[in-house]
C-alpha cells in the first residue's frame, strides 16, 4: 500500500496527509489505509479548487474558460483541509468574520467565496446518499455537503455548487484508483472514510439509565434483566417447535423419486409456433469483423487507433451509398446512417475530441428527452390520468441453432491472441513451480481461444464506456470498439470492430440507464439467419478481399442501453478465466492425489503411464462427442463467458431453481433413493424462467439431452443388476 500511495499521489499531498495523522498520534506505517483515505480526500478537495475560479466581479469560470485570463482570476474555493489544525481553525474563523456568517462547530474542508458557505467533502465506498444523510445529521445546515462514492454516484446539498466537468473529474479519479487497487488486490484492505470517524465514550447518567430501563419490552423489569435473558437464551429447536405448531395446517405426502418421474423442462422451446430466440448480446461475438492494422505494440489513444484503421480501409470509411439489407421494427434507417457518417467524420478529423454534435437524429438515437418524469405521490393520487403500468412479461421463444453455433465457434483455437494477463514473479517454493507450470498449460490453451479475444473486447469497451460516462455526462461521445491482438509470429495488430455512440449519462444510481448506439462491422449476411437479427438494422457498405476472395462487409446498427452495474461487470469480465480454470484444476488435483505426483502434463498431453484425459463435450447425431482436456477447458471457459454476456434475472432464476433438479438426478445416479414432494411445483419454478434468454433456452435444451442420456444409462444399469441377481 505504501508503494501504491507514493506512485499515485503527489509528494505534497502525502506529506500533508502524514502531518494530519501525526496531529492525531496515528502512525502512517501502521495505518496505510487511513493514509490513503486522507490522500484521496485531499486530492478531491484540490481537484474541486483547481477547476473553479472567480473574476473581480464575482463571475465564475472553469479552468478551460479561464485560459488567458489567469491574471484577473482567483480560486473560487479556499482549501482548508490539509492545514495544521490550529491554523485551519484560525482561517475558518477569519473567513466567517470577514463575510459576516456564523462559524461552524466543525472544521470544514472548503470555503466557497461565491456563495459564502463552508463545504464538507466526503468520500465513501458505500452509497453516496447514505453517507450524505449521515453527515447531514451531524452537521445540520452549518455547511454545504459534497459526497462522492467509489460506486460512481454522488450527492450534493447544492446541485449548482459543482459543474459536470468537476463531478466527472472526481468520479473518473475514483474509478481509476479503484481499478488500480483491485488490480493489486488492495481494494478489500481499504476502509471507507466513514469508518475512521472517532466515537466518544461517556458514562450514562441517572436519567438516561432510568429511561433505558423504562424502554425495555413487556416482560422485563429492567435493561440488565433483558441483557441477561438474551445472553443465556438457547435458540436451538425454535424452528422445529414452530413447524410442529403448523403441522395440522400442512398436508404433504412425500414420494420416492424414480427415473420415470423426471421429464424434460420447458417443452415450449421445441414449439415451431413460437419465434426463434433473437440475438441480444451487447456486442457481436463470432459474427464480428475486425479491421486490422499492423502496429509496433505501443499504446495509443482509442481515437488514433480507430482513425488509422479507417484510413487503411478507406473504401468502407468513405461509403455514402449503402444498401439497406434489414431493418428493425422501430428503427429509422436514415437517422442511423446519418449518425454513422457523423461518427466516421468525428474520428477522421484532426481534433483531439471525440464529441458529437446534438443533431435531431443523434437525439432520436440516444432517446434524449424521452426519460420518465418523476412526480410526487400526492400529485399522482389527485391526477385521474395517472395509473400503474402493466408489468411487461417476456414473450416465450423457442431454441435457435445460432446459440450452439456461437458456442462452437467461440471455443475454437485461432492464430491470434488478445488475452492481457499480468506477469508473475519468479518461483520461490516448489509448490510455486507446480503452479507456474500449470498456469503455462492453462494459459496456452486459453490464449488462442476465440472467446478470450471476445472477452478482451468487452473489457476494453466497457472500461472506455464507463470512463466516458463519468467524465462527459452531458455530452454525446464516439467510443471506438477496439482490441489489440498478437499473431503466432509475435506481430501486433490494432483491431477496429466498429464505433459506438454514448448518449447523456447522468447516472446517479447504479441502475440508471445510458443509451448506447453500436455500429459494428461483420461479414455475415443477416438474411442467412434472419430470425437471429430482429433487433438490428443492417447495411451493406462494401467489400474486402480476404485470402483472394471478395467478401461483403455489413454494418450492424443497434440502439441499446446499459447501466453502471453492467459496465462494471464488463470491466471485470476476466473473472470468466477463474471459474473455468478452477473447475479443471480440481480435476488435475484429484488425479495428482491418486497418482502421487503432478498430473498437469499428463492430463493435457499424456505421459509414459497415462494417456491424455478426454471428456464428453457435446453431442452429434444423438451420440456423445469426446474432446481433449484442453478442449474441455475452452468449452467451460466459453460457457462462463456466455453466462456473463447473456446474464439477467432469467438466468439467475434458472440457475438457482434447476440446481435442485440436478441434485435429485445426482442422488438417483448415486442410488440414494431421494424422496420428493411437489415435483411439478419445482418444474413450474424452473419453466417460469425459460422465456427469451438465449443462454437459458440453450441450457434447457442441453439439460433435456443430458437427461435422456442419463435415463438410458440407468436402464442399462438396471438390466445389469437383474442379470447379477439371477
Swiss-Prot record:
InterPro entries in alphabetical order: INFV_PA, PA/PA-X, PA/PA-X_sf
Cofactor: how and how many bound: Binds 2 manganese ions per subunit.
A GO biological-process term: DNA-templated transcription
Predominant place of localization: host cell
Top-level taxon: Viruses
Sites where the protein binds Mn(2+) 1: 41, 109, 120-121
Molecular-function GO terms, alphabetical: endonuclease activity; metal ion binding; RNA binding
Nuclear localization signal 1 (NLS1) (motif): residue ranges: 125-140
E.C. designation(s): 3.1.-.-
This protein's UniProt keywords: Cap snatching, Endonuclease, Eukaryotic host gene expression shutoff by virus, Eukaryotic host transcription shutoff by virus, Host cytoplasm, Host gene expression shutoff by virus, Host nucleus, Host-virus interaction, Hydrolase, Inhibition of host RNA polymerase II by virus, Manganese, Metal-binding, Nuclease, Phosphoprotein
Segments carrying motif Nuclear localization signal 2 (NLS2): 183-244
Post-translational modification: Phosphorylated on serines and threonines by host kinases, including human casein kinase II.
Binding sites annotated in the UniProt record for Mn(2+) 2: 81, 109
EC top class named in words: hydrolase
GO annotations of cellular component type: host cell cytoplasm; host cell nucleus
Compartments (UniProt record): Host cytoplasm; Host nucleus
Names of the cofactor(s): Mn(2+)
Pfam families: Flu_PA
UniProt subunit comment: Influenza RNA polymerase is composed of three subunits: PB1, PB2 and PA. Interacts (via C-terminus) with PB1 (via N-terminus).
Assigned protein family: Belongs to the influenza viruses PA family.
Role noted for this protein: Plays an essential role in viral RNA transcription and replication by forming the heterotrimeric polymerase complex together with PB1 and PB2 subunits. The complex transcribes viral mRNAs by using a unique mechanism called cap-snatching. It consists in the hijacking and cleavage of host capped pre-mRNAs. These short capped RNAs are then used as primers for viral mRNAs. The PB2 subunit is responsible for the binding of the 5' cap of cellular pre-mRNAs which are subsequently cleaved after 10-13 nucleotides by the PA subunit that carries the endonuclease activity.
Name of this chain's protein: Polymerase acidic protein
Gene for this chain: PA
Amino acid at each position: 500500500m505504501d508503494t501504491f500511495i507514493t506512485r499515485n499521489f503527489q509528494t505534497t499531498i502525502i506529506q500533508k496527509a502524514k502531518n494530519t495523522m501525526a496531529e492525531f498520534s496515528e502512525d502512517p506505517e501502521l495505518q496505510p489505509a487511513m493514509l490513503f483515505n486522507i490522500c484521496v480526500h485531499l486530492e478531491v478537495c484540490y481537484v474541486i479548487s483547481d477547476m473553479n475560479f472567480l473574476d473581480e466581479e464575482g463571475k465564475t469560470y472553469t479552468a478551460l474558460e479561464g485560459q488567458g485570463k489567469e491574471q484577473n482570476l482567483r480560486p473560487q474555493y479556499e482549501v482548508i483541509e490539509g492545514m495544521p489544525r490550529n491554523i485551519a481553525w484560525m482561517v475558518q474563523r477569519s473567513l466567517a468574520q470577514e463575510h459576516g456568517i456564523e462559524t461552524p462547530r466543525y472544521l470544514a474542508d472548503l470555503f466557497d467565496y461565491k456563495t459564502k458557505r463552508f463545504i464538507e467533502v466526503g468520500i465513501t465506498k458505500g452509497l453516496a446518499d447514505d453517507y450524505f444523510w449521515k453527515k447531514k445529521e451531524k452537521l445540520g445546515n452549518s455547511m454545504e455537503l459534497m459526497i462522492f462514492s467509489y460506486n460512481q454516484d454522488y450527492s450534493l446539498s447544492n446541485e449548482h455548487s459543482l459543474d459536470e466537468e468537476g463531478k466527472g473529474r472526481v468520479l473518473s479519479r475514483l474509478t481509476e484508483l479503484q481499478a488500480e487497487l483491485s488490480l493489486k488486490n488492495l481494494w478489500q484492505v481499504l476502509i471507507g472514510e466513514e469508518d475512521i470517524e472517532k466515537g466518544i465514550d461517556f458514562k450514562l447518567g441517572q436519567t438516561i439509565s432510568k429511561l433505558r430501563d423504562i424502554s425495555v419490552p413487556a416482560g422485563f423489569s429492567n435493561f440488565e434483566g433483558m441483557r441477561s435473558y438474551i445472553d443465556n437464551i438457547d435458540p436451538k429447536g425454535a424452528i422445529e417447535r414452530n413447524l410442529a405448531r403448523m403441522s395440522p395446517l400442512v398436508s404433504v405426502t412425500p414420494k420416492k423419486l424414480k427415473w420415470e418421474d423426471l421429464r424434460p423442462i420447458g417443452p415450449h422451446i421445441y414449439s415451431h409456433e413460437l419465434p426463434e430466440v433473437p440475438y441480444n448480446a451487447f456486442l457481436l461475438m463470432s459474427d464480428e469483423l475486425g479491421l486490422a492494422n499492423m502496429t509496433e505494440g505501443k499504446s495509443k489513444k482509442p481515437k488514433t487507433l480507430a482513425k488509422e484503421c479507417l484510413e487503411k480501409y478507406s473504401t468502407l470509411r468513405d461509403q455514402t451509398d449503402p444498401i439497406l439489407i434489414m431493418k428493425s421494427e422501430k428503427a429509422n434507417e436514415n437517422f442511423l446512417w446519418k449518425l454513422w457518417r457523423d461518427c466516421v467524420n468525428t474520428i477522421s478529423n484532426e481534433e483531439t475530441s471525440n464529441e458529437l454534435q446534438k443533431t435531431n437524429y443523434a437525439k432520436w438515437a440516444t432517446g434524449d428527452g424521452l426519460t420518465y418524469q418523476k412526480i410526487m405521490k400526492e400529485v399522482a393520487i389527485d391526477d385521474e390520468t395517472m395509473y400503474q403500468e402493466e408489468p411487461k412479461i417476456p414473450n416465450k421463444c423457442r431454441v435457435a441453432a445460432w446459440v450452439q453455433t456461437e458456442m462452437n465457434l467461440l471455443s475454437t483455437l485461432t492464430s491470434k491472441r488478445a488475452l492481457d494477463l499480468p506477469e508473475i514473479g519468479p518461483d520461490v517454493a516448489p509448490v510455486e513451480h507446480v503452479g507456474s507450470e500449470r498456469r503455462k498449460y492453462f494459459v496456452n490453451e486459453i490464449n488462442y481461444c476465440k472467446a478470450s479475444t471476445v472477452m478482451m473486447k468487452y473489457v476494453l469497451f466497457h472500461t472506455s464506456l464507463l470512463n466516458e460516462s463519468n467524465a462527459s455526462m452531458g455530452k454525446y461521445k464516439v467510443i471506438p470498439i477496439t482490441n489489440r491482438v498478437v499473431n503466432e509470429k509475435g506481430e501486433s495488430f490494432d483491431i477496429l470492430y466498429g464505433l459506438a455512440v454514448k448518449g447523456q449519462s447522468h447516472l446517479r444510481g447504479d441502475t440508471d440507464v445510458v443509451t448506447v448506439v453500436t455500429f459494428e462491422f461483420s461479414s455475415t449476411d443477416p438474411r442467412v439467419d434472419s430470425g437471429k437479427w430482429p433487433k438490428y438494422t443492417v447495411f451493406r457498405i462494401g467489400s474486402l478481399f480476404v485470402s483472394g476472395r471478395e467478401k461483403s462487409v455489413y454494418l450492424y446498427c443497434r440502439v441499446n442501453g446499459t447501466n453502471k452495474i453492467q459496465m462494471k461487470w464488463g470491466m471485470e469480465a476476466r473473472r470468466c478465466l477463474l471459474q473455468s480454470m478452477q473447475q479443471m484444476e480440481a480435476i488435475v488435483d484429484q488425479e495428482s492425489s491418486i497418482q502421487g505426483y503432478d498430473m498437469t502434463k499428463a492430463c493435457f498431453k499424456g505421459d509414459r503411464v497415462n494417456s491424455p484425459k478426454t471428456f464428453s463435450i457435446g453431442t452429434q447425431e444423438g451420440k456423445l462427442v469426446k474432446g481433449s482436456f484442453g478442449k474441455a477447458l475452452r468449452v467451460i471457459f466459453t460457457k462462463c463467458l456466455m453466462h456473463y454476456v447473456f446474464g439477467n434475472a432469467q438466468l439467475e432464476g434458472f440457475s438457482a431453481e434447476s440446481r435442485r433438479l440436478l441434485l435429485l438426478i445426482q442422488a438417483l445416479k448415486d442410488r440414494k433413493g431421494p424422496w420428493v414432494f411437489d415435483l411439478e411445483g419445482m418444474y413450474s419454478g424452473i419453466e417460469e424462467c425459460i422465456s427469451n434468454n438465449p443462454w437459458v433456452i440453450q441450457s434447457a435444451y442441453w439439460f433435456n439431452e443430458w437427461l435422456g442420456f442419463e435415463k438410458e444409462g440407468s436402464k442399462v444399469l438396471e438390466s445389469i443388476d437383474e442379470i447379477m441377481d439371477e
